[in-house]
């Protein structure tokens, strides 16, 4: 619980104002992805494989710069942006994360997380781990 509180304290500083949702269909390497509705996302909870990716200085799908010292994640079909709780099954650690990018595009993976999140959840060195992802809010949270 202490870790979760720590995550919440630095959840929004430095994030740009975003008044809406990015939910348009898109295509990657010939595969079309259709993001879920906001209503469906508000009830979303899934378990699967999380992978670590590094996008230091890259621009995410909503136009936000992603840095290794910030919390960010990528999901194929959640409306962007949204806020999720990610819990690592092996370590029991949880973190609150903003989903601001698209991916992962490797079969069998549920979510990609940045360096800071992978370290906080305890799987940075492993690269992959089983997690549960639960949506907390969608868009600007209103």
Across the structure, where does each feature detected by a protein language model lie?
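Sec-dependent bacterial lipoprotein signal peptides
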Residues: 1-7
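Secreted/periplasmic proteins
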Residues: 7-142
């Amino acid at each position: 619980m202490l870790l979760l509180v720590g995550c919440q304290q630095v959840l929004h500083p430095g994030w740009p104002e975003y008044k809406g949702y990015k939910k348009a269909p898109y295509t990657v390497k010939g595969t079309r992805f259709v993001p879920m509705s906001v209503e469906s996302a508000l009830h979303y909870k899934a378990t699967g494989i999380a992978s670590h990716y590094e996008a230091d200085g890259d621009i995410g799908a909503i136009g936000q710069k992603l840095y290794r010292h910030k919390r960010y994640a990528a999901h194929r079909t959640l409306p962007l942006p949204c806020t999720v709780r990610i819990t690592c099954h092996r370590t029991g650690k949880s973190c609150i994360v903003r989903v601001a990018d698209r991916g992962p595009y490797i079969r069998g993976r549920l979510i990609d997380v940045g360096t800071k999140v992978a370290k906080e959840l305890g799987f940075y060195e492993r690269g992959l781990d089983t997690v549960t992802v639960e949506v907390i809010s969608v868009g600007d949270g209103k």
